[in-house]
């Protein structure tokens, strides 16, 4: 009897097992892994639990058994992932996004949750200062030992309700590194619903004019970049400049632009139940188009090209790089812009990343697909800098 009791797993061992395996089971859940992935993880867990306290459970064997068990878990997760053409980290990331966005929230609470006081400081070799525009603020990030003749205007995403946060400050550093160590101006524009359309576009134009007129950067030395709602602002800014007969930027970089606020594109239907950011449950889908849950267009014509740049025409536009994920409802927003731009002979590239979600580039180098997307941005900007 005493011998049997000595072999019972110690409380600390059980605690450590749970500490290690709970994240594993969480990843399997958000991954929506096939059944055999769960089976291999459960087998691994049971084998370690069974071996603990056995005569052979001591010394170096503990390390060997533990590593072997974790390898079984990893292999099981790897082969049980739903899509073999998409990396395992990216599919886990997509599942985490789906879990987070499924939590109940409202627009104002969501916006406030992102508007946190920043403790971000520029990395070595960079400095940052804030400029007050008429109605908004502009953060200028610049190398302390550089003298680049280029600049980049960054317009952040967030459905027009979430303000500037540290992710975009990290984006700014990356953009500067990729575009000739340039100055990057990130606009902190006014937010809805307190400030309705076109306040955000007015702020974007003010930021553009500040770079061009106050800092004296020629238009053809400025790139405009934006993601999601920021991609909308970037494209709308270009349309307004072109229609006013003004010089256009050197190029545009748009990541998952929210460019069709009417939700009329095909992907707003066929990706309605698979998009982890804006999709809905299959039980709630009855063929209706699905998009960003927003009242931004209330009382407005959602097909106005300035409001929904997917409906604009892009004659005379400079080179454009569009990136989107294959499973996002906003995919067709980019496709509509791309098709129109190509019809007018614009040097426009659209890259659709398999299995990727909305603004997956926010993962920076953590996901293989995100790293590849940034490499593509780097190649595009390097061409413009020549």
How should each PLM-predicted stretch be described?
Residues 56-60:
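Amphipathic, cytosolic membrane-interfacial segments at TM-TM junctions
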Residues 4-52, 63-108, 114-386:
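Alpha/beta-hydrolase superfamily serine-hydrolase fold, recognizing
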């Amino acid at each position: 009897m005493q011998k049997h009791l000595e072999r019972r797993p110690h409380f600390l061992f059980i605690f450590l097992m749970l500490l290690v395996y709970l994240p594993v089971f969480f990843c399997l859940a958000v991954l929506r892994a096939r059944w055999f992935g769960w089976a291999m993880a459960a087998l691994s867990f049971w084998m370690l639990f069974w071996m603990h306290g056995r005569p052979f459970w001591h010394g170096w064997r503990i390390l060997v058994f533990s590593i072997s068990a974790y390898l079984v878990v990893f292999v099981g997760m790897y082969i049980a992932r739903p899509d073999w053409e998409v990396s395992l980290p990216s599919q886990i990331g997509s599942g985490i996004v789906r879990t987070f966005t499924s939590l109940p929230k409202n627009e104002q609470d969501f916006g406030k949750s992102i508007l946190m006081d920043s403790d971000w400081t520029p990395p070595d070799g960079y400095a940052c200062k804030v400029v007050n525009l008429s109605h908004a603020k502009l953060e200028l990030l610049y190398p302390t030992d550089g003298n680049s003749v280029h600049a980049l205007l960054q317009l952040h995403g967030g459905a027009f309700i979430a303000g500037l946060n540290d992710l975009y400050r990290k984006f700014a550093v990356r953009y500067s590194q990729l575009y000739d160590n340039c100055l990057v101006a990130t606009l902190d524009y006014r937010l809805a619903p307190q400030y309705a359309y076109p306040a955000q576009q007015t702020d974007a134009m003010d930021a553009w004019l500040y770079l061009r007129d106050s800092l004296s950067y020629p238009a053809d030395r400025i790139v405009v970049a934006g993601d999601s709602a920021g991609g909308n602002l970037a494209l709308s800014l270009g349309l307004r400049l072109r229609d006013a007969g003004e010089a256009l930027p050197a190029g545009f970089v748009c990541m998952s632009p929210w460019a069709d606020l009417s939700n009329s594109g095909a992907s707003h239907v066929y990706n309605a139940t698979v998009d982890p950011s804006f999709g809905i449950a299959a039980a709630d889908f009855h063929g209706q188009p699905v998009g960003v849950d927003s009242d931004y267009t209330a009382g407005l014509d959602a097909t106005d090209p300035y409001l929904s740049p997917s409906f604009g025409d892009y004659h005379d536009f400079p080179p454009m790089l569009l990136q989107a994920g294959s499973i996002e409802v906003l995919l067709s927003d980019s496709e509509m812009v791309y098709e129109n731009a190509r019809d007018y002979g614009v040097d426009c590239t659209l890259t659709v990343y398999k299995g990727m979600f909305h603004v997956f580039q926010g993962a920076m180098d953590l996901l293989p697909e995100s790293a590849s997307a940034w490499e593509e941005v780097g190649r595009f900007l390097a061409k413009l800098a020549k």
